[in-house]
Amino acid sequence: MARKLTEKVSWIGKIDWELKRFHGDEYSTHRGSTYNAYLIRDKKTVLVDTVWLPFDHEFVNNLKREIDLKEIDAIVMQHNEVDHSGALPALMQEIPDTPIYCTANGVKILKGHYHQDWNFVPVKTGDTLDLGESKLTFIEAPMLH
């Protein structure tokens, strides 16, 4: 279920109350964690990130309750590890031609995880995506979690 954050932005992620350890034993998440994904609605509609693979179908079904998937003009993948990109294969089965904006390294990571040659649009720092009344400006930030 989406949570409206602003007039144009909704959180469409997943709360995982069962996650107790993150990245092995490195971090304790004894209160669970979230997989954050956002839906931005302007003249163009953009999905930012997805959720972890075990929640892929739940994520896609929740997204379908919020929007006709064909109305998604673009997907922005800013974090490409499977805890944020895991639902991408299930989503791309529904909307296979939707452009995926991410860095060149992001393209390599996503291809490495999922072995798919989706409609990738590589971006670099300073590139923008015009949404209508607003725009996204890309910043390469490797290793940022």
Predicted regions and their residues:
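Metallo-beta-lactamase
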Residues: R3-E7, C102-H145
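Conserved beta-strand hairpin/beta-sheet module of binuclear metal-dependent hydrolase folds
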Residues: R3-R65
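Short catalytic-loop micro-motif centered on adjacent basic/acidic residues
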Residues: V46-D49, A74-M77, T137-F138
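Active-site environment of divalent metal-dependent phosphoester hydrolases
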Residues: L19, N80-S85, V107-L110, H145
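Generic structural signal for beta-strand residues in well-ordered domains
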Residues: A2-R3, H30, Q93, L129
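Active-site metal-binding motif and surrounding structural segment of the metallo-beta-lactamase
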Residues: P54-I100
